[in-house]
């Protein structure tokens, strides 16, 4: 029996808020499939249609696989009995007779029907996981129906992920049938020792690519005004390019009773006068003018950017006008300066609209056409860097050639394997713990924070062992170069004891410059004569020739 596992709406276990899953088992007894007008191809057992995953269905699958595992392990205990298929799998998915086996195209057509029935509810990427150990499936002599069905599947935007399993006495050869059907190039096949693990590649994929992503949503629909006094108005929509993903909104639930129920909240509205107070009016994007690219500063990009594109729902012809504006900005290398209010009752903000040209490749569109909307900061929001940092940046110390070469060796051996940073494989540790706890609660499992598997949820922890094994000796060489540098040696002066007279002369110059204010506040007694003399740059020692002139003059100035 060959099994084909179909997982829709998520690539490589990339879980969405509404992840869809369905299971298709081929070469099953037709009588095991319920007779239904909407039924799929005969001989294919649809264990679960493509719909949102819930805890009850996952529990049913887990229980089925646990029972099958127990039955299979029970056969291993008796060496005199040959291991066979677990009874629960044969009962749940009864195999069809070899004389009634159907063409493999029926399985692909069933996948087509599943995605078709899912309709517009399917979001994100769509993939089919093919798991089989049969490199010569039924109907391989007539391949045209399978090619046609797979072509129809790709028109839905569905791709196939194959996991071919080696048998103990046979190595799987995809060149016989599957590479031809899936429109893949033939590989160099060698009849080596079969892989004893079988599903090792699938296990590695499940371990490394368990990713949770948030669905991409449009953040706002606003009008874009051009010309004098906004004579030209078009509709635009914007989506966030970078958005911080947080935990879901908390909800109150009623734990008592047979079923956990959500508590229904009641919302009360205030009077219309209270709601209308502080209204800022409509929320458009009004173009004020155009600037050259040299007017932009990198440090002014403080907030998350938005990407805007035309929206024809409110204003007809928005796409044509939007394209003309985009092409003009690209032609003259200009960006638009605008005043925007993206949400109702928000304070207006200045922004720039940076054009982006469409770029395509052999794989399709890489960069869509549109504008990047970047919020500009107000003057009060800008802070200068610390004085020491500014001085350091003006004249930074220059490393020697030996130090540079030593660090090059360290960087070369500690870089990413893919030579690029992939943020999708580094989930937020806090969210990873949160979702894992929710999963344990849904499946009624214990959650132990000391479990090594739970500690491994934090993918941001550096792999110190691998780093030191690859670049440990080069790190030591770099440290030696730094230690031998004379600039890294600091001479610490011995601390000196401060005398009583020196303590009395310590004063805050800012307080001395605000003596009239201190007199008004009644804190003038905190100052001393010596402190005042220090500010006036008068001598501290020596005999006063004019007899008390300083004391009288200072006292008089205190009361002014």
Curated annotation (Swiss-Prot):
Q: Which GO terms describe its biological process?
A: DNA recombination; double-strand break repair via nonhomologous end joining; telomere maintenance
User: What is a single Pfam family found in this protein's UniProt entry?
Assistant: Ku_N
Family annotation (InterPro entries):
Ku70, Ku70/Ku80_beta-barrel_dom, KU70_core_dom, Ku_C, Ku_N, SPOC-like_C_dom_sf, vWFA_dom_sf
Question: Record's SUPFAM superfamilies?
Answer: SPOC domain-like, vWA-like
- Catalyses which reaction(s): ATP + H2O = ADP + phosphate + H(+)
Matches recorded under SMART domains: Ku78
Entry's Gene Ontology molecular function annotations: ATP binding; ATP hydrolysis activity; damaged DNA binding; DNA helicase activity; double-stranded DNA binding; telomeric DNA binding
The EC number(s) attached to this protein equal: 3.6.4.12
> Which CDD domains does the annotation name?
KU70
Q: What does this protein do?
A: Single-stranded DNA-dependent ATP-dependent helicase. Involved in non-homologous end joining (NHEJ) DNA double strand break repair. DNA-binding is sequence-independent but has a high affinity to nicks in double-stranded DNA and to the ends of duplex DNA. Binds to naturally occurring chromosomal ends, and therefore provides chromosomal end protection. Required also for telomere recombination to repair telomeric ends in the absence of telomerase. KU70, of the KU70/KU80 heterodimer, binds to the stem loop of TLC1, the RNA component of telomerase. Involved in telomere maintenance.
User: What binding partners and quaternary form does the record give?
Assistant: Heterodimer of Ku70 and Ku80.
Protein's name according to its UniProt entry: ATP-dependent DNA helicase II subunit 1
Q: What is the originating organism of this protein?
A: Cryptococcus neoformans var. neoformans serotype D (strain B-3501A) (Filobasidiella neoformans)
């Amino acid at each position: 029996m060959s099994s084909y596992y179909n997982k829709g709406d998520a690539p490589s276990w990339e879980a969405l808020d509404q992840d869809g899953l369905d299971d298709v088992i081929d070469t099953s007894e037709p009588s095991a499939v319920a007779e239904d007008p909407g039924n799929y191809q005969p001989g294919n057992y649809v264990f679960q249609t493509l719909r949102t995953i819930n805890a009850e269905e996952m529990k049913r699958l887990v229980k089925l696989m646990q029972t099958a595992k127990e039955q299979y392990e029970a056969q291993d205990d008796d060496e005199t009995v040959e291991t066979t298929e677990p009874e629960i799998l044969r009962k749940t998915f009864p195999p069809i007779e070899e004389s009634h086996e159907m063409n493999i195209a029926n399985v692909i057509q069933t996948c087509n029907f599943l995605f078709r029935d899912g309709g517009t509810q399917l979001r994100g990427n769509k993939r089919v996981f093919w798991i089989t150990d049969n490199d010569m499936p039924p109907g391989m002599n007539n391949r045209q129906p399978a090619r046609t069905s797979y072509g129809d599947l790709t028109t839905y935007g569905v791709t196939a992920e194959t996991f071919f399993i080696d048998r103990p006495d046979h190595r799987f050869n995809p060149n016989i049938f599957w590479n031809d059907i899936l429109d893949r190039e033939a590989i160099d096949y060698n009849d080596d020792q079969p892989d004893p693990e079988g599903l090792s590649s699938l296990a590695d994929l499940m371990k490394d690519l368990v990713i949770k992503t948030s669905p991409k949503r449009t953040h706002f629909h606003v009008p874009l005004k051009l010309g004098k006094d906004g004579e030209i108005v078009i509709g635009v929509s914007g989506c966030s390019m970078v958005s911080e993903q947080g935990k879901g909104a908390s909800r109150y639930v009623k734990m008592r009773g047979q079923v956990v129920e959500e508590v229904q909240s009641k919302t009360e509205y205030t009077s219309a006068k209270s709601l209308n107070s502080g209204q800022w009016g409509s929320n458009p994007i009004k173009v004020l003018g155009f600037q050259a690219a040299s007017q932009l500063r990198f440090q002014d990009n403080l907030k998350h950017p938005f990407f805007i594109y035309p929206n024809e729902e409110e204003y007809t012809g928005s796409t044509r006008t939007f394209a003309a504006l985009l092409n003009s900005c690209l032609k003259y290398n200009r960006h638009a300066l605008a005043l925007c209010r993206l949400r109702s009752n928000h304070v207006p903000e200045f922004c720039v609209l940076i054009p982006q040209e469409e770029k395509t490749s052999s794989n399709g569109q890489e960069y869509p056409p549109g504008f990047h909307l970047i919020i500009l900061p107000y003057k009060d929001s800008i802070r200068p860097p610390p004085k020491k940092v500014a001085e350091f940046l003006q004249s930074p110390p220059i490393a020697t050639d030996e130090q540079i070469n030593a660090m090059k060796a360290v960087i070369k051996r500690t870089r990413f394997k893919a030579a690029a940073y992939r943020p999708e494989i580094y989930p937020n540790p806090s969210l990873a713990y949160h979702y894992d706890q929710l999963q344990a609660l849904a499946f009624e499992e214990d959650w132990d924070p000391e479990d090594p598997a739970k500690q491994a949820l934090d993918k941001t922890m550096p792999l110190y062992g691998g780093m030191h094994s690859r670049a440990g000796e080069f790190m030591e060489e770099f440290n030696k170069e730094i230690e031998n540098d004379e600039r890294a040696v600091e001479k610490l002066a011995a601390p000196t004891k401060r005398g009583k007279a020196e303590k009395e002369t310590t004063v805050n110059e800012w307080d001395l410059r605000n003596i009239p204010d201190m007199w008004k506040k009644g804190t003038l007694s905190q100052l001393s004569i010596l402190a005042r003399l220090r500010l006036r740059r008068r001598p501290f020692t020596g005999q006063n020739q004019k007899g008390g002139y300083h004391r009288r003059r200072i006292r008089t100035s205190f009361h002014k």
